[in-house]
């Protein structure tokens, strides 16, 4: 039986990518971002290590959903107090905090453990077209989430 390949932590140099969420389908965009965060697109991928890259998402306010999700999809949060459940539709949350929609979708696709929480910190989401990470020299990554486009 072969041993699992473990890359040394010194050989891991994460890249920075910029993704434009304008008119991208939410779920398809989130799956591709989650794969980049985990490092599954690299040949040195190891399930128990952080081999992923940083992802900057811009124009989160322009992300698209299909069907009636804009009015029927509900986001819930709880304050921890009795009766503290708050619900909000996709449209209301998009107008109030558009970054949270993409963060919520990607977070659900990452592992639910310490590694997943560390991977989530590599995701940077911004509502508008500007971001403060120019010093990292991020590469523009074009993701095709619409079939045939």
From Swiss-Prot:
InterPro entries, per database record: Ribosomal_uL13, Ribosomal_uL13_bac-type, Ribosomal_uL13_CS, Ribosomal_uL13_sf
GO cellular component, one term: cytosolic large ribosomal subunit
Keywords tagged on the record: Ribonucleoprotein, Ribosomal protein
Signal sequence, start to end: none
Example GO biological process: translation
Single annotated GO MF: mRNA binding
Subunit structure: Part of the 50S ribosomal subunit.
UniProt family annotation: Belongs to the universal ribosomal protein uL13 family.
General function of this protein: This protein is one of the early assembly proteins of the 50S ribosomal subunit, although it is not seen to bind rRNA by itself. It is important during the early stages of 50S assembly.
Record-given protein name: Large ribosomal subunit protein uL13
Protein encoded by which gene: rplM
């Amino acid at each position: 039986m072969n041993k699992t390949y473990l890359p040394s932590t010194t050989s891991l140099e994460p890249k920075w990518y910029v993704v434009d969420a304008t008119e991208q389908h939410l779920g398809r965009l989130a799956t591709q971002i989650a794969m980049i965060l985990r490092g599954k697109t690299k040949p040195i991928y190891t399930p128990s290590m952080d081999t992923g890259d940083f992802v900057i998402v811009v124009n989160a306010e322009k992300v698209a959903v299909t069907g009636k999700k804009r009015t029927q999809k509900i986001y819930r949060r709880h304050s921890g107090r009795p009766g503290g459940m708050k619900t909000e539709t996709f449209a209301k949350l998009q107008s109030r905090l558009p970054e949270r929609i993409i963060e919520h979708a990607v977070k659900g696709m990452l592992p639910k453990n310490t590694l997943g929480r560390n991977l989530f910190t590599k995701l940077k989401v911004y509502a508008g077209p500007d971001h403060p990470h120019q010093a990292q020299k991020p590469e523009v990554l074009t993701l095709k989430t619409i079939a045939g486009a």
